[in-house]
A protein has these predicted regions:
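Short linear motifs in intrinsically disordered
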Residues: 1, 19, 116, 142-147
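Catalytic and substrate-binding regions of extracellular carbohydrate-active enzymes
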Residues: 1-107, 111
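Short, ordered beta-strand-loop transition motifs
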Residues: 46-57, 79-85, 122, 129-132, ...
């Protein structure tokens, strides 16, 4: 084995370009507008650190996203609180070339379980959405997907490493979803989708806990 068990790993199952474009383990967001889609993990930028009390803040320089007939200027801030198992990620829409336009923001996490380049058996993983209704998927590599508008949490439990990973969102109107992988792309996906407009801020939290 090459590392401790991981869900997202920099060397193995690594990022956007691993195996299948967009199917490596990654925590990112996609912006969609009129059939076009751009992933923020493909937008290089710089960042700087600051600290407020016990919270360290990573502020990324704004990136400009160009669609055919719309330009969006977006800034990301990430918050790491000492002693916490939660990471807060904020997306700020700073400017739009058309202030009345609306884009779809898809905050997502793609992950799998393993210690090497190849994932372990994920058959015991359980995906779940909590909210106005509860939906679950018992992992069977069938490429299934479920979604709930107004979801309070989307989560995955990995019994082999006694881990529960989840995402929550700042807007109760956002749609939470979970996606199951398949044999040649076994990773699972947790995410939230929301329509967002000029000057709006949308926050999500990536949460890690011990599963009993």
């Amino acid at each position: 084995d090459a590392s401790y068990p991981f869900l997202i790993q920099e060397k193995y199952r690594a990022g956007y370009f691993t195996h299948y474009a967009g199917e490596g383990t990654v925590r990112s967001a996609k912006l969609s507008y009129k059939g076009e889609e751009i992933d923020l993990c493909l937008c290089p930028t710089h960042a700087h650190f600051s600290q407020e009390g016990k919270t360290r803040i990573l502020t990324l320089d704004p990136v400009t996203i160009e669609f055919n007939d719309l330009t969006v200027k977006l800034q990301t801030k990430e918050y790491f609180e000492e002693g916490s198992s939660n990471i807060k990620i904020e997306r700020h829409i700073l400017e739009m070339s058309n202030p009345d336009a609306e884009v779809t923001l898809n905050e997502y996490m793609v992950a799998c379980y393993g210690t090497t380049e190849y994932s372990e058996d994920m058959s015991n993983i359980k995906l779940r959405i909590d909210g106005p209704e509860v939906k679950t998927i018992d992992y069977a590599y069938k490429c299934r997907e479920e979604g709930v508008v107004g979801a309070t949490e989307v989560s995955a439990v990995v019994p082999e490493i006694e881990t529960r990973v989840s995402m929550t969102a700042s807007d109760s109107a956002a749609e939470g979803y979970v996606k199951e992988g398949y044999a040649f792309s076994p990773m699972f996906t947790l995410g939230y989708k929301k329509t967002i407009s000029d000057k709006e801020v949308f926050a999500t939290w990536l949460n890690l806990a011990k599963a009993n």
